[in-house]
Structures are given as C-alpha cells and as structure tokens.
C-alpha cells in the first residue's frame, strides 16, 4: 500500500501511514483521529502492524490470519515497527511484527499469515443473521465520545448499548449479543487494512452487560479473513454487519467472539479476543 501523506488522504490512511527506515523497519506516528482512553484505538494499531507486513518487499499473497498482542499502551508520538519473514511456503507466508517506542520498549507484537488463494471447492454453512438494512436504522450519536468512535458509523439492529450509569447493578444485566452495521466515516472503500481495524470496533461486551463504563483493554485479538482482494473490492464502501457476543466473564478477563458480514450475506471475517476488565 502506498504511503498516505497528502492532506487530502482519508483519516484512516493517515493514521496507518508508514515510512520505510531500512530493511524490515518502518516509522509511524499515532493519530488523534483514532484516539481511545489511554492510547490509539486497538483496531488502528492492528491495521498499522498489518500495513508494515503488506508493504514489505518480500510479501506474497494476501492476509488470512493475524494475532495481535497488546503489551502496553502506545504513547502519543512516534513508533517503530520491525517486520520479520519467518517462513515462506508454496502457498503461505508467515511473519512476526513488533511495535516499539524508544526507551518504553515493545508496546505490541503480532503474527500474520498470508496466502495465495486459489479457486477451489467452497461451502458456506454459516448463514448471516437477519437484520434490517442499515439505511432503515438510526445512526448511533458519537459526537463528544472517544475520537475513534467518531471515525465509524454504527447502526444497531440488536443490542443497542444502554446509556451508561454511574454504578453497575448486577440485578439488571443486559444482553451480551449485538448486531450492528459498521462503516468507515467518512466513507472509504474496504480493504484488508480497514477490515482489520473494523474487526476490533465492537464495544466491550461488559459495557452491554453491566450498562456502565468499566475500564477494559484488549490483551490479545486474532482475526481470520475469509475473502480475497476481489471479494473485498465488491463490497466497496458499504456497511458490514457485525455480530459480537461473549462466553464468559471471570476473574478479570472475558472473551469476545465476532463475525463481519457483507450486505450480500458473505462472511468476510471472524475474530476472537481476550479482554481485561477491572470491576
């Protein structure tokens, strides 16, 4: 992907922009447009790490899987990403990626798998949940909320989060499942990088369940991509239907399982997270 440095570039492209600095090394800076509570939105960090691998001169194929481990908050300012090719096979290629900030050390690590997809037999037993078209649903107001939330349009079909209350009430828990149409704002054609970011754009499941703003942070996220470049291009800048749920909250950690569907009913990506919470 070409470096996005022009002022006319989409905010997302500016946020993930990298400059090469020697073999397998890139330099970047955090973006105010995707700021979260204590650092950049985790999705844009994941996309930036993936961008480094995609820009490597030895990269083959397209991404099919990526695991990101968030080791520490990324501070405002510059960072360095180091990318290392671990092994290249006939059809797959494996990478390790590391983001560091000077004396603060490593803030995130990742492994990524790329593949040369081929035409094969296909079967799609999983079916997209029924949901009204996004245009028929109200957009969630995000003005005044975290900057990263203002970078997306959210239209909930199920599981709209309740207004946060100051103190959680365990005798009034909400559902953990949500169905939400998600798109970049302003609109931007979907690609592997923005898909990686959107895979982390679900609100914390504990916000839905306890109806309160509780400190959380993703510790590790794995995203699997089920489409190739042509299939992503067919989606354009349209909404994706995000389906997210959890299995357990226990002793400070919870999981999140998620799916992203195109409007046409194609499963585009799935993701799994382990999330820290303080309660």
Residue ranges of model-derived segments:
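Terminal targeting signals and extreme-terminal segments of soluble enzymes
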Residues: 1-279
């Amino acid at each position: 992907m070409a470096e996005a440095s022009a002022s006319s570039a989409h905010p997302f492209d500016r946020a993930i922009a990298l400059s090469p600095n020697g073999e397998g090394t890139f330099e970047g800076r955090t973006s105010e447009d995707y700021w979260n509570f204590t650092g950049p939105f985790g999705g844009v960090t994941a996309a930036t790490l993936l961008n480094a691998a995609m820009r490597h001169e030895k990269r083959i194929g397209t991404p099919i899987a990526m695991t990101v481990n968030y080791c520490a908050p990324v501070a405002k300012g510059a960072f360095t990403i180091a990318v290392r090719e671990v092994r290249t096979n006939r059809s797959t290629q494996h990478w390790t990626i590391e983001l560091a900030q000077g004396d603060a050390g490593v803030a995130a690590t990742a492994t990524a798998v790329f593949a040369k997809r081929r035409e094969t037999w296909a079967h799609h037993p999983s079916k997209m949940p029924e949901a009204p078209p996004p245009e028929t649903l109200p957009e969630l107001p995000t003005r005044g909320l975290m900057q990263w939330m203002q970078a997306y349009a959210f239209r909930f079909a199920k599981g709209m989060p309740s207004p946060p209350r100051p103190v959680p009430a365990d005798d009034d828990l909400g559902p953990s499942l949500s169905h939400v149409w998600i798109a970049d704002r302003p609109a931007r054609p979907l690609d592997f990088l923005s898909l990686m970011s959107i895979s982390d754009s679900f609100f914390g499941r504990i916000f839905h369940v306890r109806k309160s703003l509780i400190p959380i942070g993703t510790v590790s996220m794995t995203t699997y991509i089920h489409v190739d470049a042509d299939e992503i291009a067919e989606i354009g800048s349209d909404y994706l239907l995000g389906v997210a749920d959890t299995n357990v909250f226990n002793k400070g950690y919870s999981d999140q399982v998620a799916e992203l569907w195109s409007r046409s009913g194609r499963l585009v990506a799935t993701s799994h997270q382990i999330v820290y919470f303080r309660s």
